[in-house]
Swiss-Prot record:
Cofactors named for this entry: Mn(2+)
Protein name: Uncharacterized peptidase SAR1786
Co-factor binding comment: Binds 2 manganese ions per subunit.
Protein origin, superkingdom: Bacteria
Transmembrane segments: none
Gene3D superfamilies: Creatinase/methionine aminopeptidase superfamily (3.90.230.10), Creatinase/prolidase N-terminal domain (3.40.350.10)
Binding site for Mn(2+) 2: D215, D226, E333
One Pfam match: Creatinase_N
Natural source organism: Staphylococcus aureus (strain MRSA252)
EC number, UniProt record: 3.4.-.-
Similarity-based family: Belongs to the peptidase M24B family.
């Protein structure tokens, strides 16, 4: 079943006339055309009969024509009201309620004479949750480039280098491999600075005998990777190394349990129980992982409350961590494809 037919099914389920998609990444997912419209209207209208209409600034029309999108294009000037160029009466419209602003909703009510709204967010999330072979290949390449980033960063480590200098070196060097954009702000944290799970790299200088935490990802043809490694620089304290070994055991055990039909919460429990049994449960303050694709964090989450089942074609992260203030912060993260038989680890830098 195609993406569009899934949306049409949801329109029928909710007795709606059309769906209005405005998140740029979701528009790209359905059309193959990517735009960052800023304050301008950029939206895909999917009607119950399968017709697709893309609203975009007139200056982008030629680019849309050159894209895979084959539906109707409504290009508008900044001085024009886009809705006046495509007059419609839509009784019930499905929207991305998590994204659409109140101001835009008011425009839809007046522009399309909308009487009521429904939600299409979950349907789109479920579609994006299962990756096609093409999407998997792009994520696999993004993961390969993330491995290269870690390699670049580790080779640059030396006493007195700052966290910020390592970040800059990684992001500048990886451009030589065709990377134009990272998935998120690269994180490099030294020693007990890594005890802050989302710490900000700064001017702290590297000293012998501490761990270095790398958390980074690369975007390849719109698809993200997201991986973490915690690397020894010298010989960290015995407690820090003990923490590392516990995190590695938790991650390895959770990954080995991955296969279709297993509840996501069970995977979280495996890692969390290992960490808790070793006395560090209070120092593991976040979920075990999350979905990965067009965004570095997307549906679904690998958490203790998610009863949904793993399915072949999902790509998730597994990233247990222990963060002890004044001692160390250790996190290890890999990107995992759920296969028909079990799993495939997409990130490979040594642990």
């Amino acid at each position: 079943m195609t993406k569009i037919s899934k949306i049409i099914d949801e329109l029928n389920n909710q007795q709606a006339d059309a769906a209005w998609i405005t998140t740029p990444l979701n528009v790209y997912y359905f059309t193959g055309y990517r735009s960052e419209p800023h304050e301008r209207l950029f939206a895909l209208l999917i009607k119950k009969d399968g017709k697709q209409v893309l609203f975009c600034p007139k200056m982008e029309v030629e680019e849309v024509k050159a894209s895979p999108f084959t539906g109707e294009i409504v290009g508008y000037l900044d001085t024009e009201n886009p809705f006046s160029l495509y007059p419609q009466t839509i009784n019930k419209l499905l929207i991305e309620s998590e994204h659409l602003t109140v101001a835009r909703q008011k425009q839809l009510i007046s522009g399309f004479n909308v009487n009521s709204f429904g939600d299409v967010d979950l349907t789109i999330k479920q579609l994006r949750n299962i990756k096609s072979e093409d999407e998997i290949n792009k994520i696999r390449k993004a993961a390969e480039l993330a491995d290269k980033c870690i390699e670049i960063g580790v080779s640059y480590l030396k006493e007195s280098v700052t966290e910020r200098e390592v970040v800059n070196h990684i992001e500048q060097t990886i451009k030589q491999y065709g990377v134009n954009e990272m998935s998120f702000d690269t994180m490099v944290l030294f020693g007990d600075h890594a005890a802050s799970p989302h710490g900000t790299p700064g001017d702290r200088r590297l000293k012998s005998n501490e761990y270095v935490l790398f958390d980074l990802g690369v975007i390849y043809e719109h698809y993200c990777s997201d991986m973490t490694r915690t690397i020894k620089f010298g010989e960290p304290s015995q407690e820090a190394q003990e923490i590392y070994n516990i995190v590695l055991e938790a991650e390895t055990s959770a990954i080995q349990a991955i296969k279709p039909g297993i509840p996501l919460k069970d995977i979280d429990h495996i890692a969390r129980n290992i960490i808790s049994e070793k006395g560090y449960g209070e120092y593991f303050p976040h979920r075990l992982g999350h979905g990965l694709g067009l965004q570095e964090h997307e549906y679904q989450d690998v958490s203790s409350t998610n009863s949904n089942l793993l399915e072949a074609g999902m790509v998730i992260t597994i990233e247990p961590g222990i963060y002890v203030p004044g001692v160390a912060g250790v996190r290890i993260e890999d990107d995992i494809l759920v296969t028909n038989e079990g799993y495939e680890v997409l990130t490979h830098y040594e642990k």
